[in-house]
């Protein structure tokens, strides 16, 4: 045993051979899953449908955040944009453009 002590003093790296292995690496706990989104079905436009058809004013049971419109909404589309336009009762033009 005294001989081992001399060897360990002379060659300190020998101590690594008999040390217990480090504990296994544990992956961090996973984040909770995101809540599921409501899935909406896409409606594909037929070639025969007119893309510039005025839509009805949406009906809702809650009060609208903006004043109601005097004209129905109009929808215009291109290959990469969707534009919805309407005019409120006080004459303000509201345009929403979605870039796809």
From Swiss-Prot:
InterPro entries on file: Papilloma_E4
GO cellular component terms given for this protein: host cell cytoplasm; host cell nucleus
Primary residence: host cell
Subcellular location per the Swiss-Prot or TrEMBL entry: Host cytoplasm; Host nucleus
One Pfam family here: Pap_E4
Record's comment on post-translational modification: Phosphorylated by host ERK. The phosphorylation triggers a structural change that enhances keratin binding and protein stability.
Keyword Phosphoprotein in annotation: yes
Keyword line: Early protein, Host cytoplasm, Host G2/M cell cycle arrest by virus, Host nucleus, Host-virus interaction, Modulation of host cell cycle by virus, Phosphoprotein
An annotated GO BP: symbiont-mediated arrest of host cell cycle during G2/M transition
Subunit structure: Assembles into oligomeric complexes. Interacts with host CDK1. Interacts with host SRPK1; this interaction may favor expression of late viral transcripts. Interacts with host cytokeratin components KRT8 and KRT18.
Functional description taken from the UniProt entry: Contributes to multiple aspects of the viral life cycle including viral genome amplification, suppression of suprabasal cell differentiation and egress of newly formed virions. Induces host cell cycle arrest at the G2 phase by associating with and preventing the nuclear entry of host CDK1/cyclin B1 complexes. Inhibits cellular DNA replication by preventing loading of host replication licensing proteins MCM2 and MCM7 onto chromatin. Within the cytoplasm, associates with host kinase SRPK1, a splicing factor regulator, and inhibits its activity.
Extra remark: The major E4 form is first synthesized as an E1^E4 fusion protein from spliced E1^E4 transcripts, such that the first few amino acids of the E4 protein are derived from the N terminus of E1.
Family, as annotated: Belongs to the papillomaviridae E4 protein family.
Protein name: Protein E4
Protein encoded by which gene: E4
């Amino acid at each position: 045993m005294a001989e081992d002590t001399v060897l360990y003093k002379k060659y300190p790296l020998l101590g690594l051979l008999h040390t217990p292995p480090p504990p296994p690496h544990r992956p961090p706990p996973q984040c909770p899953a995101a809540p599921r989104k409501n899935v909406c079905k896409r409606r594909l436009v037929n070639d025969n449908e007119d893309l510039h058809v005025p839509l009805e004013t949406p009906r809702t049971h809650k009060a609208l955040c903006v004043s109601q419109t005097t004209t129905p909404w109009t929808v215009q589309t291109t290959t990469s944009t969707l534009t919805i336009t309407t005019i409120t009762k006080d004459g303000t033009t509201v345009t929403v453009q979605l870039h796809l």
